């Protein structure tokens, strides 16, 4: 006890402090319990937080929700003096001594600015040696043999040219005749159906010959060997396919159903003419009606089918014209097979 001017200092009662702390803790526990009850029963207080049920003036309970927010930088960033516009402005000011000329009315908006020159497109060509590739401009590649990957990408970028309705040829939207020329040879692979001319390609990407398909030519294609025109030497198609990075030469389009049948009769290797081959049916895999059904199930065949038979009562189809269409799309069948296929489906046709 300290005495000062006859007065005694008030004594500090520790029990009172403990009671106040207990009351504060008890009130806090009650508020938490009430908050949990409201969160379970009512839907509206779910948006509230725990600190909204606490008294702000309660000094004994630490308000842990007050977290010091980091300093928010202003949205306006400093002007970059290294941008394209600032660099061009600086160059223009150095070139023109008078700065006032920059803002004069005599200058037009087009007289000042930054333009990026467009580079000419470069294409790779396959030369005599496979390793050496010459880069040429777009104007020069018409007289060159373009690399197959470049040729395919160019052909895919071209817009397809649809034929007239009376031609009934190449109705598949992916097929088109390119404007580049016959010297770019991998058209046999990028067309939706087999083209009416086979391009024979050498190991170095050169065009060896062109061959119109026939039944005998189709037999040679199925055997994997095709004969050069006016030459006894045989040309290995598998070797030509490996020249373009292809392990197996595709006799039909990738992604399309192959024109093969369930029959397992082997193709007889013979030297007969086309008439005897057709009469003796030595090629059952080619001269089969299921090839017609397979063709009309393909995307291009569906379009042709709907075009021909959208009004079958009013439209009478000539079987010779239909056979010519099938032959041009790579489906080789005899006329009798086509007649039987049409009769099974009750399609009106003219012989």
From Swiss-Prot:
GO CC terms: cytoplasm; cytosol; mitotic spindle; nucleus
GO BP term (any one): DNA double-strand break processing
GO molecular function, a single term: endodeoxyribonuclease activator activity
Protein name in the entry: Uncharacterized protein C1322.02
Origin species: Schizosaccharomyces pombe (strain 972 / ATCC 24843)
């Amino acid at each position: 006890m300290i005495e000062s001017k006859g007065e005694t200092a008030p004594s500090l009662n520790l029990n009172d402090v403990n009671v106040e702390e207990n009351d504060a803790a008890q009130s806090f526990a009650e508020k938490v319990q009430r908050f949990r009850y409201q969160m379970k029963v009512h839907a509206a207080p779910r948006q509230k937080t725990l600190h909204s049920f606490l008294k702000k003036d309660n000094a004994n309970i630490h308000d842990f929700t007050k977290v010091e927010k980091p300093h928010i930088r202003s949205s306006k960033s400093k002007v970059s003096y290294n941008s394209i516009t600032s660099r061009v402005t600086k160059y223009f000011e150095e070139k023109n001594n008078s700065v006032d000329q920059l803002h004069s009315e005599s200058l037009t908006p087009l007289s000042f600015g930054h333009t990026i020159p467009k580079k000419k497109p470069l294409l790779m060509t396959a030369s005599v040696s496979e390793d050496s590739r010459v880069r040429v401009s777009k104007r020069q590649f018409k007289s060159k043999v373009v690399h197959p990957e470049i040729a395919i990408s160019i052909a895919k970028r071209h817009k397809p040219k649809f034929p007239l309705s009376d031609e009934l040829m190449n109705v598949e939207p992916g097929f088109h005749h390119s404007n580049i020329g016959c010297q770019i040879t991998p058209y046999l692979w990028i067309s939706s159906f087999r083209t009416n001319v086979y391009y024979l390609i050498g190991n170095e990407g050169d065009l060896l010959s062109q061959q119109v398909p026939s039944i005998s030519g189709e037999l040679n294609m199925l055997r994997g060997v095709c004969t050069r025109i006016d030459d006894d030497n045989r040309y290995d198609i598998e070797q030509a396919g490996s020249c373009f990075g292809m392990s197996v030469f595709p006799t039909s389009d990738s992604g399309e159903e192959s024109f093969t049948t369930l029959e397992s009769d082997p193709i007889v290797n013979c030297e007969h003419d086309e008439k005897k081959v057709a009469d003796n049916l030595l090629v059952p895999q080619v001269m089969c009606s299921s090839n017609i059904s397979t063709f009309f199930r393909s995307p291009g065949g569906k379009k042709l089918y709907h075009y021909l038979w959208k009004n079958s009562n009013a439209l009478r189809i000539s079987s010779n014209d239909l056979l010519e269409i099938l032959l041009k799309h790579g489906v080789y069948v005899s006329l009798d097979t086509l007649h039987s296929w049409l009769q099974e489906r009750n399609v009106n046709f003219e012989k």
